[in-house]
């Protein structure tokens, strides 16, 4: 099913949140149907079984409780350049809920304002790759309405980007905070495992 897999990434958390797990594995597929079929194929394959056995001392994955999301890049993910050649990056994920009376349309409008802020950033104030994405949970009973994810070249450029947002976000920041409430971010170092468009990772 690799032809329908859009990418795979690993995340090693650097946030001390006292949870029972310390890493994330993300698989992106062309559809939920393809994701479910691919997962079942992996579980039933000798290759998958052998891989799990070989690396059992390295990681234990909670596959039964995996979560599904619809993902979008609301802004060109390469507007600030390409990701590092070695596939490394840093990421922050915040669980967000829409405030009372706010809707998906309000979220869309505030993302337009955020995109406008990104458009007007002085290039001299930034360094390295940056992109952001929104994850909408498939589970209708999920506590969060969406996850807001920021992807940076490394932890240093993440800190620089956060400071720039705090200092110059202005009305876009005010409006975003008026639409949703987001948790403290879960911060990780990430790594590309599979990218069908890059021979080094496919």
Please tell me what each predicted stretch does.
Residues 1-202:
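Short S/T/G/P-rich N-terminal loop/turn motif that feeds into the first structured element of a domain
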């Amino acid at each position: 099913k690799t032809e329908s897999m859009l990418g795979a990434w690993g995340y090693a958390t650097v946030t001390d949140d006292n949870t029972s797990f310390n890493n994330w594995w993300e698989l992106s597929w062309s559809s939920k149907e393809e994701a479910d079929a691919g997962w079942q194929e992996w579980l039933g394959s000798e290759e998958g079984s052998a891989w799990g056995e070989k690396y059992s001392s390295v990681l234990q994955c909670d596959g039964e409780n995996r979560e599904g999301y619809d993902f979008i890049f609301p802004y060109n993910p390469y507007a600030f350049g390409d990701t590092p050649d070695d596939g490394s990056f840093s990421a922050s994920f915040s669980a967000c809920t829409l405030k009372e009376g706010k809707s998906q349309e309000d979220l869309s409008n505030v993302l337009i304002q955020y995109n406008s802020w990104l458009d007007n950033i002085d290039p001299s104030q930034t360094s390295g790759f940056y992109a952001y994405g929104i994850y909408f949970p498939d589970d209708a009973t999920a506590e969060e309405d969406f996850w807001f994810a920021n992807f940076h070249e490394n932890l240093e450029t993440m800190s620089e980007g956060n400071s720039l947002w705090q200092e110059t976000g202005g009305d876009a920041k005010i409006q975003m905070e008026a639409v949703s409430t987001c948790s403290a971010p879960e911060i990780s170092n990430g790594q590309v495992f599979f990218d069908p468009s890059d021979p080094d990772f496919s």
